[in-house]
């Protein structure tokens, strides 16, 4: 293992030299003692032809040379436009996760070991030639004994040791960068590698992908917007996934879509509707909707339907995040930058001590040039990206789900404009968001919310005791405490206030039946109502 690690180190070094990534490194404002290390690098004393490639292109080619794990890491980096320079992020978007297929005999052996049966006993036909091959898995076509056409996804064998080794080097590079450069620390490289570690290991578990696909299929059951293939759960294992095979037109095949007279305007608008439906209706969204994972049904070209595959990466938002995101978008397009700043602070996305006036001015400076364009030319994804970049300057904590959401929105938006260049996202999204906000704050929704909070009443005594114990500890009031913990305390106090209000209302109703609310027996109800109201207003 140590020998393999040393060989991998030399491989990384060769790639760094070949693509002159050391030039990029020493262009950073490093400490003098690190900059002096260039004198110890023998290849820097040799004449080298200046590279005609941009820095982004050199980084992309280097990641491609280092193999699939580094390629996928580059793809993850390309979604972090709130952190990376635009030229580098654009180049990394070009990375393709395509690797040669592994031996079909290995695929068959793995399927048989996972299913505990011979391939011929499970499938009436199994194509040994794969349909597609990527860094984590490859896909084979097959037919079940019952006649259904399916695809079989198989995890690439021997992948975990390779991933562990490459992740170790990525962590080492990230930690070194954080120690060496203040600019690097601002990018949180160790945190980014940590996110990637979770993502790549999640993709190795095909049962997780199967569960995601089942959830998405259930969410869009009977919908004309999107179709998700059926999962055959009895044939799914951690390293094997069997799904319905779909036959559709790749969403980038414009010629075929045009030949079958697909309504391109409606198709583009439905893409936007799919995104907002997932985010705001379902709070569960496909977070890898690049063109390779999206097809179009050929059944009704006048009412086109999307088909989504590869549900390995998904995202979700809390009810609070949904609310703040919707309010942010509406405030943005009204150019109400102060409201945007206030929402960020209220949500806890930026620290509570942030000066609203300064934050508002920064948002205005960045966003006003965007809104000088016609609405149909404004990029939703660019708006979110600029917002995140600005908020990072005010110490906004990284919100992984919002990063996934921004990446998904950029994919959907780019796809929609490719299908129909005059797509006006705002005219499609605005009615959806306004309708969602009305429904969210309708009397029916408010009553449902009150009912769900009332379910916490049996736990009120324990919650009160725990909260009082925490508040009695002086160090919890230390202003240096993480903002997230203090935000949690505020939400806990709000919940406690709601519980006291609910309990007081129940006691008041009981007292009203027995006697008068002015009677001595009603004082606990009044006390609980007053305390609950105070906590909610105070917070």
Curated annotation (Swiss-Prot):
Record membrane topology: Multi-pass membrane protein
Keywords: ATP-binding, Cell inner membrane, Cell membrane, Kinase, Membrane, Nucleotide-binding, Transferase, Transmembrane, Transmembrane helix, Ubiquinone biosynthesis
Positions bound to ATP: 131-139, 153
Protein's cellular compartments: Cell inner membrane
GO cellular component: plasma membrane
TM region positions: 495-515, 517-537
Ranges of residues in domain Protein kinase: 125-493
Signal peptide: none
InterPro entries in UniProt: ABC1_dom (IPR004147), Kinase-like_dom_sf (IPR011009), UbiB (IPR010232), UbiB_bact (IPR045308), UbiB_kinase (IPR050154)
The EC number(s) this enzyme carries: 2.7.-.-
UniProt pathway: Cofactor biosynthesis; ubiquinone biosynthesis [regulation]
Keyword Repeat carried by entry: no
GO molecular function: ATP binding; protein kinase activity
Record-linked PANTHER family: CHAPERONE-ACTIVITY OF BC1 COMPLEX CABC1 -RELATED (PTHR10566), PROTEIN ACTIVITY OF BC1 COMPLEX KINASE 7, CHLOROPLASTIC (PTHR10566:SF113)
Homology family: Belongs to the ABC1 family. UbiB subfamily.
Role description: Is probably a protein kinase regulator of UbiI activity which is involved in aerobic coenzyme Q (ubiquinone) biosynthesis.
Record protein name field: Probable protein kinase UbiB
Protein's gene: ubiB
């Amino acid at each position: 293992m140590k020998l393999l690690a040393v060989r991998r180190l030399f491989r990384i070094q060769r790639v760094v030299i070949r693509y002159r990534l050391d030039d990029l490194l020493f262009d950073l404002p490093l400490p003098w003692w690190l900059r002096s290390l260039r004198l110890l690098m023998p290849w820097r004393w040799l004449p080298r032809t200046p590279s005609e490639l941009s820095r982004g292109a050199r980084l992309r080619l280097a990641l491609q040379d280092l193999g699939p794990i580094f390629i996928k890491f580059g793809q993850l980096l390309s979604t972090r436009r709130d952190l990376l320079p635009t030229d580098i992020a654009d180049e990394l978007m070009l990375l393709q996760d395509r690797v040669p297929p592994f031996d079909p005999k290995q695929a068959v052996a793995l399927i048989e070991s996972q299913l505990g049966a011979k391939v011929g006993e499970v499938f009436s036909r199994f194509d040994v030639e794969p349909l597609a091959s990527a860094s984590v898995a490859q896909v084979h076509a097959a037919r079940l004994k019952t006649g259904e056409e399916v695809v079989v996804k198989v995890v690439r064998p021997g992948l975990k040791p390779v991933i562990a080794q490459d992740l170790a080097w990525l962590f080492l590079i990230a930690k070194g960068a954080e120690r060496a450069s203040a600019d690097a620390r601002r990018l949180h490289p160790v945190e980014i590698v940590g996110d990637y570690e979770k993502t790549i290991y999640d993709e190795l578990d095909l049962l997780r992908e199967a569960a995601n696909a089942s959830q998405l299929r259930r969410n869009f059951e009977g919908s004309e917007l999107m179709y998700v293939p059926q999962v055959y759960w009895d044939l799914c294992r951690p390293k094997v996934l069997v799904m319905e095979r779909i036959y559709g037109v790749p969403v980038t095949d414009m010629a075929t879509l045009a030949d079958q007279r697909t309504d391109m305007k409606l198709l583009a608008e439905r893409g936007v509707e799919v995104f907002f439906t997932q985010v705001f209706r379902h709070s569960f969204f496909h977070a890898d909707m690049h063109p390779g994972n999206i097809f179009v049904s050929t059944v009704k070209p006048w009412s086109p339907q999307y088909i989504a595959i590869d549900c390995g990466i998904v995202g979700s938002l809390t009810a609070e995040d949904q609310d703040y995101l919707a309010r942010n978008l509406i405030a943005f397009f009204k150019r109400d930058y102060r409201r945007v700043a206030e929402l960020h602070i209220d949500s806890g996305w930026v620290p509570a001590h942030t000066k609203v006036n300064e934050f508002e001015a920064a948002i205005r400076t960045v966003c006003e040039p965007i809104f000088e364009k016609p609405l149909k030319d404004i990029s939703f994804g660019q708006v979110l990206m600029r917002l995140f970049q600005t908020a990072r300057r005010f110490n906004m904590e990284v919100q992984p789900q919002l990063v996934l959401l921004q990446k998904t929105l950029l994919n959907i938006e780019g796809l929609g404009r490719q299908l129909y260049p005059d797509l006006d996202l705002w005219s499609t999204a605005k009615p959806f968001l306004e309708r969602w906000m009305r429904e969210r704050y309708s009397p029916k929704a408010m009553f449902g919310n009150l009912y769900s909070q009332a379910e916490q009443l049996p736990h009120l005594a324990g919650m009160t005791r725990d909260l009082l114990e925490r508040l009695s500890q002086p160090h919890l009031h230390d202003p240096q405490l993480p903002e997230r913990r203090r935000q949690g305390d505020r939400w806990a106090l709000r919940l406690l206030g709601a519980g006291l209000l609910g309990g007081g209302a129940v006691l008041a109703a009981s007292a009203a039946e027995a006697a008068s609310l002015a009677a001595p027996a009603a004082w606990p109800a009044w006390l609980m109502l007053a305390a609950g109201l105070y906590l909610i207003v105070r917070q």
